[in-house]
Amino acid sequence: MKFQFIAKHRGIWPVAWMCGALGVSRSGFHAWLIRPPSQRARDDEVIGAKVRASHVGSYRTYGARRVWHDLLADGVSCGLHRIERLIRAQGLRARPRRRGLPKDHGDRSVIAGNVLDRQFTADRPNQKWVADFTYIWTAEGWLYVAAVIDLFSRRVVGWSMSPNMTAQLVTDALIMAIWRRGKPDALLHHSDQGSQYTSEQFQRLMADNGVTCSMIRSGNVWDNAAMESFFSSLKTERIGKKIYRTRAQAKADVFDYIECFYNPTRRHSTLGYLSPIDFEREAGVA
């Protein structure tokens, strides 16, 4: 490691000075320079390139464990600690999570109980859906993004985007989910107590499709932790460091994140590091 440090910084500081400071001989350093790299070093170079490709391919959001599962899926045999070392050596860092935005405080019409009760797993598709919406700032003003996630596979089955924070926003997301998955049988829909979800329009849509309503307790975001996790990932992995000039630009980016990355590609620890679509495919329901 000392010789590697010297080789890396010899364009900045004199070799003789670094050898003296690190307690190694100059002859030993020069002998190390001309020595052919070991098999492990050559393997590190190959695996390191795959590590970087996985990290960049995830929009620089994957940490060591997800990169490791990416490489295992590609048939690369290596340990997690080796991946962690190669990530550190290349200075790769996953984007940190950011705090969310405040929730809606409009009038509530219908409040349902917390039927889900933090049971964020499902035995089959279309058994439990969770829903929420978030805000994205653009130079044209706010863009509101609503989403519906199937807890069986964490797949985003419905989404909607609008410049207005209305009942139509969340209604459109649920309509898409029903259109994609078919009319549900014994489905539980879980959301917060926002005025959009308690509206007569939204409640009528659920009643017409035989959907049971569940809502978080007031002020308790952990009652919808799976949904909070998705929006946290969206902000961390895609929109957090971007400035959108138009709502159309933001819409296109959110669409790309959901349909081209999150659903088909992004690995989830809760799914054994499979993507939602791969998880459904392995379960024989995709």
Regions found by a protein language model. Give the residues of each.
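Charged DNA-binding/catalytic regions of mobile-element recombinases
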Residues: M1-A286
